[in-house]
Amino acid sequence: MFLNILKSLFHNFGVVAVGFGVALLGRGLDYLLGITDFQSLVASIAGVPLLALGFFLRAWATLHFYQHRMKVISLSPQQTLITTGPYRFSRTPLFLGGNVFIFFGASMMLGSPSALLITALHIPIVDLLIRREEKQLEQTFGEEWLRYKERVRRWL
């Protein structure tokens, strides 16, 4: 269990780094385009709970993957349908935590309008990827997936 916690923390600190990378990219774009940032203490403080919530949600979801002896990033299809922990509330807690909360939180903390826009624009793309994955999950898990899908929302 301790090793799973360490792996989860390591994996999710990487996602936070990517979130700040997107925010820094946005800051650079703001500078190149002459867009005024909105960096302030209030915006920075507002970003902290978003980032923390995203990290917690991803860590919780990652731990559930590890407890089921699954990889968070895998090219092979899932063999287990996880419906416990954060998966009781969202079918996509990894994406919700990372691609939404962490990315928006980092963008707020750095006060970058471009980073917020990049984050907002990539969510529909991620949603398309999720829909594709869900078709595969339906083929793999059949009726079990359909019952889960009916009970739990994709995002929130």
Where are these regions (language model features)?
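Membrane-anchoring alpha-helices and their flanking helix-loop junctions
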Residues: 1-84, 97-156
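Histidine-centered phosphotransfer motif of kinases
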Residues: 89-96
